[in-house]
């Protein structure tokens, strides 16, 4: 079922009857040569190659008559500004996507005390972050628990895994690899 724009619609008498009724109710919004419709609400926005379009709910028309309109066809700057302000509020409230699974729904991961992970076997170092003033490794242990370990402690307790972590992420710029045997 396609939705048609009431501005461009030529469906028949029922739409024309509604237009005639609107002309009687609001003569200021009706011109003799062309129809001007009243915007009830701006519902959505999309970007197209031609520019911005807004999804409009027309006053006096059902939800099924909503349509996408280019900004050039609209004369409701205040409503568009209000919609943009509300849309900006909605986007700032959204949380950013993190590929790492969340370990706590309400609080960030806090640095662990050594008794929480003492005696556990380190499975992998996931990442590194600067938590309250110093660097911490985000470590996953064999029991699938995740803890923030201070850099100094990780260097002492898990030196080989720390080196392996750095080696997998180290990128040298401006250094050409040499091939053993004299060729470079």
Curated annotation (Swiss-Prot):
> Nucleus: present as a keyword of the record?
yes
Which one GO biological process term can you cite for this protein?
negative regulation of gene expression
Q: What happens when the gene is disrupted?
A: RNAi-mediated knockdown in a hpl-2 mutant background causes larval arrest.
**Chromo domain: which residues?**
37-95
Region annotated Disordered, chain positions? 1-27, 87-115
Q: Which SMART domains match?
A: CHROMO, ChSh
What Gene3D superfamilies does its record include?
A: 2.40.50.40
| PROSITE patterns reported in the protein's UniProt record | CHROMO_1, CHROMO_2
Where is composition skewed (Polar residues) in this entry? 1-13, 99-115
Q: Name one GO cellular component term.
A: pericentric heterochromatin
Does the record carry Transcription as a key word?
A: yes
The Swiss-Prot or TrEMBL record annotates one GO molecular function as: enzyme binding
State the UniProt keywords alphabetically.
Chromatin regulator, Nucleus, Transcription, Transcription regulation
Q: Where in the cell is it found?
A: Nucleus
Pfam families in UniProt: Chromo (PF00385), Chromo_shadow (PF01393)
Question: Which PANTHER family does the entry link to?
Answer: CHROMOBOX PROTEIN (PTHR22812)
User: Any idea what job this protein has?
Assistant: Seems to be involved in transcriptional silencing in heterochromatin-like complexes. Involved in epigenetic repression. Probably does not act as global transcriptional repressor. Plays a role in linking epigenetic regulation with the innate immune response. Acting in concert with chromobox protein homolog hpl-2 and histone H1 protein his-24, involved in reproduction, somatic gonad development, male tail development and vulval cell fate decisions; perhaps as a result of modulating expression of Hox genes mab-5 and egl-5.
On assembly, the entry states: Interacts with histone demethylase spr-5. Interacts with chromobox protein homolog hpl-2. Interacts with histone H3 tails methylated at 'Lys-9' (H3K9me3) and 'Lys-23'(H3K23me2). Interacts with histone H1 variant his-24 (when monomethylated at 'Lys-14'); the interaction is direct. May interact with the REST corepressor rcor-1, histone deacetylase hda-1, and the histone demethylase lsd-1.
Its name, as the record gives it, is: Chromobox protein homolog hpl-1
């Amino acid at each position: 079922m396609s939705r048609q724009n009431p501005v461009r619609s030529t469906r028949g008498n029922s739409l024309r009857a509604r237009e005639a009724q609107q002309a009687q109710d609001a003569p200021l919004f009706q011109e003799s040569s062309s129809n001007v419709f009243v915007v009830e609400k701006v519902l959505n926005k999309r970007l197209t190659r031609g520019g911005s379009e807004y999804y409009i709910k027309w006053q006096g028309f059902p939800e099924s008559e909503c349509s996408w309109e280019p900004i050039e066809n609209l004369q409701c700057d205040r409503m568009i500004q209000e919609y943009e302000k509300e849309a900006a509020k909605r986007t700032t409230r959204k949380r950013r996507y993190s590929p790492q699974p969340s370990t706590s729904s309400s609080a960030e991961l806090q640095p662990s005390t050594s008794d929480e992970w003492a005696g556990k076997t380190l499975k992998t170092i996931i990442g590194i972050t600067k938590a309250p003033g110093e660097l911490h490794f985000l470590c996953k242990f064999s029991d699938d628990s995740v803890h923030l370990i201070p850099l100094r402690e990780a260097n002492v307790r898990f030196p080989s895994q720390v080196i392996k972590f750095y080696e997998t992420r180290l990128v040298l710029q401006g250094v050409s690899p040499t091939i053993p045997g004299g060729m470079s």
